[in-house]
């Protein structure tokens, strides 16, 4: 279990210490579950009333909240960001693998940097290049001539097809597949003729990809994921998609082929985005958005009907289904009124 003096933690977090710096911090916890040795954080003033009941040894908070502190405190401008950084310092997550497992199959032509770990039953094919401190979890497959940059980690059962490039300090969760064939077919009088997918997937640095996500290889050009992109679980990213730096994609999103998304975008969960078009920088699509046309202006975009009581929704749906008839009737009434005038 990691531990650190509160004063040392404050220094690493560039926080202002109030209280005993010799307190030993052993973990991060919520305000409700924290006990002695824990540090917690408060991001909303409405939780001030809970400080009196909180058992944490220290609390991260803003200057405005400091008068309400009942324990040692670290004062910062952004408690949530500080929480993320202190959680990294006190992280107890094990590595996906340690050392080279005896059952790992590593081709003689593969190149491994220093301090590489490969888990049980993983397969590393010919021509693969693994940078320093790369960790390959149990049961992973890394296809021919693929490259994985220094410090990147693959959890168990990740599949990386041939000729894929993954940058430095990336994290890929279990059962994700990178570089499978895109959905490319030509129609010959009702019969589907497969188009070999000859492109690659290029993933930048500091990219994180959730579990059970699929990113298809390009048909001719490459599928490209920019630096700092974060992608949640169970997303489908089709061939030739390009995602700009630092864009966030929530769970269950489906992106059709040849879509280009700009930088600093946020795509809400279960959204569906049409292909062969562009979305500009700094666009937010709220959950379950259906994006059928290009977006050329930054901003927040929504579609769909929010949840309603069933009876209300049925009435709304009935009105929508009859909107064409209502429009025709309204136009007829307008013509009659105009004639009377």
UniProtKB/Swiss-Prot annotation:
<dbReference type="InterPro" id="IPR007691">
    <property type="entry name" value="LpxD"/>
</dbReference>
<keyword id="KW-0677">Repeat</keyword>
<keyword id="KW-0808">Transferase</keyword>
<dbReference type="GO" id="GO:0016020">
    <property type="term" value="C:membrane"/>
</dbReference>
<comment type="pathway">
    <text>Glycolipid biosynthesis; lipid IV(A) biosynthesis; lipid IV(A) from (3R)-3-hydroxytetradecanoyl-[acyl-carrier-protein] and UDP-N-acetyl-alpha-D-glucosamine: step 3/6.</text>
</comment>
<keyword id="KW-0012">Acyltransferase</keyword>
<comment type="similarity">
    <text>Belongs to the transferase hexapeptide repeat family. LpxD subfamily.</text>
</comment>
<dbReference type="InterPro" id="IPR001451">
    <property type="entry name" value="Hexapep"/>
</dbReference>
<dbReference type="GO" id="GO:0009245">
    <property type="term" value="P:lipid A biosynthetic process"/>
</dbReference>
<dbReference type="GO" id="GO:0103118">
    <property type="term" value="F:UDP-3-O-(R-3-hydroxymyristoyl)-glucosamine N-acyltransferase activity"/>
</dbReference>
<comment type="function">
    <text>Catalyzes the N-acylation of UDP-3-O-(hydroxytetradecanoyl)glucosamine using 3-hydroxytetradecanoyl-ACP as the acyl donor. Is involved in the biosynthesis of lipid A, a phosphorylated glycolipid that anchors the lipopolysaccharide to the outer membrane of the cell.</text>
</comment>
<keyword id="KW-0443">Lipid metabolism</keyword>
<keyword id="KW-0444">Lipid biosynthesis</keyword>
<dbReference type="GO" id="GO:0016410">
    <property type="term" value="F:N-acyltransferase activity"/>
</dbReference>
<feature type="active site" description="Proton acceptor">
    <location>
        <position position="239"/>
    </location>
</feature>
<comment type="subunit">
    <text>Homotrimer.</text>
</comment>
<dbReference type="InterPro" id="IPR018357">
    <property type="entry name" value="Hexapep_transf_CS"/>
</dbReference>
<keyword id="KW-0441">Lipid A biosynthesis</keyword>
<protein>
    <recommendedName>
        <fullName>UDP-3-O-(3-hydroxymyristoyl)glucosamine N-acyltransferase</fullName>
        <ecNumber>2.3.1.191</ecNumber>
    </recommendedName>
</protein>
<dbReference type="Pfam" id="PF04613">
    <property type="entry name" value="LpxD"/>
</dbReference>
<dbReference type="InterPro" id="IPR011004">
    <property type="entry name" value="Trimer_LpxA-like_sf"/>
</dbReference>
<dbReference type="InterPro" id="IPR020573">
    <property type="entry name" value="UDP_GlcNAc_AcTrfase_non-rep"/>
</dbReference>
<dbReference type="Pfam" id="PF00132">
    <property type="entry name" value="Hexapep"/>
</dbReference>
